[in-house]
Amino acid sequence: MTNLRKTHPLMKIINDSFIDLPTPSNISAWWNFGSLLGMCLIIQILTGLFLAMHYTSDTLTAFSSVAHICRDVNYGWLIRNIHANGASMFFVCLFLHVGRGIYYGSYLYKETWNIGVILLLTVMATAFVGYVLPWGQMSFWGATVITNLLSAIPYIGNTLVEWIWGGFSVDKATLTRFFAFHFILPFIILAMVVVHLLFLHETGSSNPTGLNPDSDKIPFHPYYTIKDILGLFLMIIILLSLAMFSPDLLGDPDNFTPANPLNTPPHIKPEWYFLFAYAILRSIPNKLGGVLALLMSILVLLIIPLLHTSTQRSMAFRPISQTLFWMLTANLIILTWIGGQPVEQPYIIIGQWASISYFTIIIILMPLAGMLENYMLKPKFP
């Protein structure tokens, strides 16, 4: 069996990726999130497939087909709740995974990092089109508001919006194509995940110290398979608790009302995992400026490797950078809170300051902190 595992063309790929993979001996639980994200993706694809068997992408029947799934399909309520809350778990793991990458300098593996940022954008796009499918009030108005942002693009904006809508408003054509996108994108994500892993396995994992781990590596199996399974069980317990005991905790009550183009909800807001970007969008009083800031809030991750000034890779031994990192984390929590509040004082000014500090910390303060720490580490004696 050992021989086959190492010689069979397919088994060899699996063996080199998940069994005999040399892994640093000191990677912490922060390195669990990659496998958790893989599991989230599998859960979402499977539950989504079963939902798609019963869902109809028509404006007249979409809302009632979701109700039918929850009421009449065997365990339909569970499948739907796991799928809806699985998206939240996906984003929790994503944010922690990206945060780990920033803290421990994983972004210096540039190919892996860049593919990861593109993956993040693709997952966000998938979640957005998926949120439109139940065709509730917030689905409809969320789709209307967010797609309308593209009209800020000079010259081609309005044409582009109507092209995406498939008409002059969000309607049947929009819902049908969003369902098509939502079905195909997870498989594109799956392919990109393979590329992400391919680039990662070219260099191997980083580790909490930021030092070269080649001198002390252990096989992935059994050490990290066991560790990943523990993380997986914890995640599944949290996901099932959420899906079974409070499935609507993270949703919007407006989505229990069927979509009505004649009635606007009092506060249009996206799902919680987009609120930080939505707050940045709203903090700029100009439409095009807001759209650019929204894009930059994610795309700024692409320039993080270029802004690395420290002689050390990880933040483990850099207290000033650590302080800035946790300030950035707090800042993102504030932005998430602001994104869910109405557009009135004091929320407007808090959102604007939080947006400015978000970009300032990443683009200006973190590189300066790296330079300062380098200076402080230089021997001062003659």
Curated annotation (Swiss-Prot):
One of the record's GO molecular function terms: ubiquinol-cytochrome-c reductase activity
Bound cofactor: record note: Binds 2 heme b groups non-covalently.
Binding site for heme b b566: H97, H196
Sequence positions that bind heme b b562: H83, H182
Other comment: Heme 1 (or BL or b562) is low-potential and absorbs at about 562 nm, and heme 2 (or BH or b566) is high-potential and absorbs at about 566 nm.
Quaternary structure (record): The cytochrome bc1 complex contains 11 subunits: 3 respiratory subunits (MT-CYB, CYC1 and UQCRFS1), 2 core proteins (UQCRC1 and UQCRC2) and 6 low-molecular weight proteins (UQCRH/QCR6, UQCRB/QCR7, UQCRQ/QCR8, UQCR10/QCR9, UQCR11/QCR10 and a cleavage product of UQCRFS1). This cytochrome bc1 complex then forms a dimer.
Protein name per the record: Cytochrome b
Lineage: Eukaryota, Metazoa, Chordata, Craniata, Vertebrata
